[in-house]
Amino acid sequence: MEALGKLKQFDAYPKTLEDFRVKTCGGATVTIVSGLLMLLLFLSELQYYLTTEVHPELYVDKSRGDKLKINIDVLFPHMPCAYLSIDAMDVAGEQQLDVEHNLFKQRLDKDGTPVSSEAERHELGKVEVTVFGPDSLDPDRCESCYGAEAEDIKCCNTCEDVREAYRRRGAFKNPDTIEQCRREGFSQKMQEQKNEGCQVYGFLEVNKVAGNFHFAPGKSFQQSHVHVHDLQSFGLDNINMTHYIQHLSFGEDYPGIVNPLDHTNVTAPQASMMFQYFVKVVPTVYMKVDGEVLRTNQFSVTRHEKVANGLLGDQGLPGVFVLYELSPMMVKLTEKHRSFTHFLTGVCAIIGGMFTVAGLIDSLIYHSARAIQKKIDLGKTT
């Protein structure tokens, strides 16, 4: 018993008898409000604890031979699908080989509504034209090239063959004077889509090297190791490259990613504008808390625009160009659970802090009320 008596001397929380305790309405109000605040702060701390935190790290990118997946969804409200070509080039200006892609073109009317329910699958570097059914023609025929024959081009059985032959000569005749083009409805196709727009969506998988992909009018080809587009045969007088980028990303999305070009609306101030997007791609590895590893990319971008009146030379080519280069550094983002001890510390701080503040407020209210009451009572006696 003597030992217990000595132990009581260390009690930092001495108790008073119940008869000497005074309960007030102000104290009850402070208790209820502080209890609600304590519960709210506890739930906030619990929610914070249940979320994961992401730790970034920076490494040198040592990956080799990987592919770069480019997700595309771009609308051209004033550029018909029949006129639009899409190409992927490497840093040297050569057309990329072994490019896997799944791109589609959707014709749009002037209000942006799809003209047809099905989109056309697009081949890189080609424009879409309606081809006459070959079943009714002699498969062994050899039709005229209209004076544009060459050593490797003796027969021109399609409008595209005639256009290619004349392209090498530097000029293309009126398609209405060429039997193959009349038969395939080349002019009708161009006229039919003249006031339409086009939505291009899908993905490209290119080699993981610096390069570009672009949307430009006309048929593309290589001439003396220079990439050019044939616009003459399409009769394009007013090239409007106004565009709306619904989505553009390099790889899969991960939680919290920001694609800076999403929902970008650009209006061409005049005809024949060339829009260039200079993109810096940063390889990124995102490791989820369950162990799943996601290899993707982030990117930053700057935009430049100018008038392009020429088909070759410094004036450039009307269109939308995305020129990308890859960073030598890699970002690793790792999801981790938050510390349980940190959660306990936060809860204790909330409870202790609220009790302390509530006690101070209650004491202030109680003693202030007593002081006021004393003055009132003193005034009555005098």
Swiss-Prot record:
- Give the N-acetylmethionine positions (modified residues): 1
Q: Where in the cell is it found?
A: Endoplasmic reticulum-Golgi intermediate compartment membrane; Golgi apparatus, cis-Golgi network membrane; Endoplasmic reticulum membrane
Q: Where on the chain is Phosphoserine found, per UniProt?
A: 116
Residue ranges in the Cytoplasmic topological domain are 1-25, 362-382
Q: Name the domain of life this protein comes from.
A: Eukaryota
Keyword Cytoplasm recorded: no
Q: Which residues lie on this side of the membrane: Lumenal?
A: 47-340
| Membrane topology classification | Multi-pass membrane protein
* A Gene Ontology biological process term: endoplasmic reticulum to Golgi vesicle-mediated transport
* Residue stretches spanning the membrane: 26-46, 341-361
Q: Does the keyword Mitochondrion apply?
A: no
Recorded family membership:
Belongs to the ERGIC family.
Q: What does this protein do?
A: Possible role in transport between endoplasmic reticulum and Golgi. Positively regulates trafficking of the secretory proteins alpha1-antitrypsin/SERPINA1 and HP/haptoglobin.
Assembly behavior: Forms homodimers. May form a heteromeric complex composed of ERGIC1, ERGIC2 and ERGIC3. Within the complex, the interaction with ERGIC1 is direct. Interacts with ERGIC1/ERGIC32. Interacts with ERGIC2, the interaction is required for the stable expression of both proteins. Interacts with MARCHF2. Interacts with SERPINA1/alpha1-antitrypsin and HP/haptoglobin.
| Protein name as it appears in the record | Endoplasmic reticulum-Golgi intermediate compartment protein 3
Q: Which organism is it from?
A: Macaca fascicularis (Crab-eating macaque)
